[in-house]
UniProtKB/Swiss-Prot annotation:
Source species of the chain: Danio rerio
Protein name as annotated: Protein ripply3
A GO CC annotation given for this chain: nucleus
Role noted for this protein: Probable transcriptional regulator involved in developmental processes.
Motif (WRPW motif): 18-21
Region annotated Ripply homology domain, chain positions: 50-85
Domain note: The Ripply homology domain and the WRPW motif are both necessary for its transcriptional corepressor activity on the transcription activator TBX1.
Signal peptide: none
Record region (Disordered): 87-110
Family listed: Belongs to the ripply family.
UniProt-recorded Gene Ontology molecular function terms: transcription corepressor activity
Cell compartment(s), UniProt: Nucleus
GO biological process: embryonic pattern specification; negative regulation of transcription by RNA polymerase II; secondary heart field specification
Top-rank taxon: Eukaryota
Length: 110
């Protein structure tokens, strides 16, 4: 588990570890403990529901991964998965794939 710290430099010095099964005192107020230690949560509007996915355009993938990605993920308060989507016209890619498939078929014919 990674420590809950903003900077990577502080991560090694930070003493509090984030554990998804441990509730902070603020979160614990919104839960009831039932028999057997089972917790019941009341719904709240501002809570993230896992899995959290951040959808980013493929055309800016290099920019996000090199420069902005670390700041985006550092400012996002929960674990998230990055998903890149195609935001450009993919017709040229489809034509290239068809040409490549035709070439491959021609190469493997006896």
């Amino acid at each position: 588990m990674l420590p809950v710290c903003v900077d990577a430099d502080q991560a090694l010095r930070c003493s509090v570890l984030w554990r998804p099964w441990s509730l902070s005192p603020t979160e614990a107020r919104g839960h009831k403990t039932l028999a057997g230690g089972v917790r019941s949560a009341r719904p709240s509007g501002g809570v993230f529901h896992h899995p959290v996915r951040l959808f980013l355009p493929r055309s800016r993938m290099q920019e996000y991964l090199s420069r902005l990605g670390s700041s985006v993920l550092a400012s996002f308060p929960v674990q998230a998965t990055l998903h890149f989507y195609n935001d450009e016209d993919s017709s040229s890619e489809e034509e290239e794939d068809e040409e490549h498939a035709n070439t491959r078929c021609r190469l493997w014919r006896p």
